[in-house]
Amino acid sequence: MTVALVQMDIAWGDTRANIRTAERLMLSAARSDLYVLPEMWNTGVNPDPRSLPPLRFAQAQAEAPCPLQWMQQMADRLDAAVAGSMAVSLPDGTYRNRLYFVEPHETVNGKWLNGKWYDKHHLFSYGGETEHFTPGGEQVTVEWRGVRFRLSVCYDLRFPLWLRNRDDYDALICVASWPSVRMHAWKVLLQARAIENQCYVLGVNRIGHDPYCDYSGGTTLVDPFGQPTSCPDHEACVLTQTLDLKRLRSFRRKFPVLEEMDAIPQVLT
């Protein structure tokens, strides 16, 4: 499987501009099986989603409007899955930081069917995210073209128990808006999650700046041995890599770390 990790600048609150940027970059890496966009790729991350145009859940379910509709159109056009997170307003008045995993040909008469998503569990209290967003409570794994992907968003990366692999996924996706000031931690944590879980890790981060932070990128694919391949810092980039499941499974058989992990209750007690 070929994956394309899209490192892009995000225009603050300008969905149309961000769609144009993402589309141009994605088309430069045609023939991939999966495209992954950064956290809140359509607006940029804002701790108060009321000041940005959130995707309304009811509309997303019924009509798949822009930008979710655009993700579906690109999935159809490229015959590939497209993943990326955005702020979503639910009917109960709460907001979620929702990572959508959109597969091709999932709409019938304009209605989105069989949608898959993950709501960010660990909200970034340091940045005020807990004041307006509601955390998700479920771990989500999606299978696409024979590869099992665990979904996560940004701050989730710091919590290894939440991302513990029980041999139920092959690759971890982490979409982020991770600031330059903590870039060393980002790179180390991506490698740590790959090594301890014997999996591929797809870490997708943005570049540029917003009213709160500067972002240098660091979009990286880490293989199960902990070897990283990264985009250049501060540059728009599409990192394309192949996930080799045969090699992954052979490694797990020969070096069965997942079979010998402590049970979570034992760790906690």
List the predicted regions and their residue ranges.
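Active-site catalytic loop in hydrolytic enzyme cores
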Residues: 59, 63, 89-166, 182-188, ...
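Short polar catalytic/cofactor-binding loops
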Residues: 7-12
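Cys-nucleophile CN-hydrolase/nitrilase-fold catalytic domain and related Cys-dependent amidase chemistry
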Residues: 15, 23-111, 179-193
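C-terminal beta-strand edge segments of enzyme domains
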Residues: 116, 141, 206-269
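CN hydrolase (nitrilase-like) catalytic-core segments centered on the catalytic cysteine
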Residues: 62-83, 157-239
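Short beta->alpha transition motifs characteristic of CBS
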Residues: 43, 100-103, 118-124, 220, ...
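Extreme N-terminal starter segment of soluble prokaryotic enzymes
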Residues: 1-5
